[in-house]
């Protein structure tokens, strides 16, 4: 996938950010969307303790050439924030909700831009649907055992064994 130069000057209706809410797994998921759905899609997964708001300046720039989707994960931003008794705030569960969210808005082929807390969620999406992910762009993605356990279990078990032997 090539990434054309961005033109921040263009500001037509295709680059206007749309603010929406989608009901997924009993939760209201808030998201920002811009660009034409006929273009390649980039899904932006935010960090902790942030929300899709962190991408407010990036979304219009990307939307000149891409369809951009940035959701607030459950417990963040304008999405529902159920109590820990009502919702399992694990990376596995967050990834499951985000997977169902993307299905519900008919996004089935996309690149992911992952940052911080969004990295373990994005990697789980990739493990579940490698055929859907066209590219992974990471910015300061979390790289600790809890966040990457299922990823490292598939990719580099010797790395985990070396880490355990040092402790």
Enumerate the language-model features and the residues they cover:
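Structural cue for short, hydrophobic secondary-structure segments
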Residues: 44-47, 70
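Surface-exposed alpha-helical interface segments used for non-catalytic interactions
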Residues: 53-56, 60, 96, 123
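Recognition helices and adjacent regulatory flanks at domain boundaries
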Residues: 54, 73-76
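Conserved coupling/switch loop of ABC ATPases
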Residues: 46, 50, 115
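A short, Lys/Arg-enriched amphipathic alpha-helix followed by its capping loop at the start of a domain
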Residues: 57-66, 104
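Flexible "cap/lid" subdomain of the alpha/beta-hydrolase fold that forms the substrate-access gate
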Residues: 3-29, 34-41, 69, 76-113, ...
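Serine-hydrolase catalytic-loop signature spanning alpha/beta hydrolases and amidase-signature enzymes
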Residues: 38, 49-57, 68
């Amino acid at each position: 996938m090539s990434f054309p130069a961005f033109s921040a000057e263009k500001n037509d209706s295709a680059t206007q950010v749309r603010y929406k809410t989608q009901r997924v797994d009993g939760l209201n998921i808030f998201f920002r969307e811009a660009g034409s759905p006929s273009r390649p899609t980039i899904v932006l997964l935010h960090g902790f303790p942030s929300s899709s708001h962190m991408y407010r300046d990036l979304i219009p720039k990307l939307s000149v050439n891409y369809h951009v989707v940035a959701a607030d994960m459950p417990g963040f931003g304008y999405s529902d924030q159920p109590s820990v008794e009502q919702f399992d705030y694990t990376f596995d569960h967050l990834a499951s909700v985000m997977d169902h969210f993307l299905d519900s808005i008919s996004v089935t082929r996309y690149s992911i831009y992952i940052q911080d807390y969004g990295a373990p969620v994005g990697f789980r999406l990739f493990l579940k649907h490698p055929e859907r992910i066209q590219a992974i762009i990471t910015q300061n993605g979390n790289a600790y055992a809890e966040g990457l356990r299922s990823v490292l279990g598939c990719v580099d078990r010797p790395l985990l064994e070396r880490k355990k032997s040092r402790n």
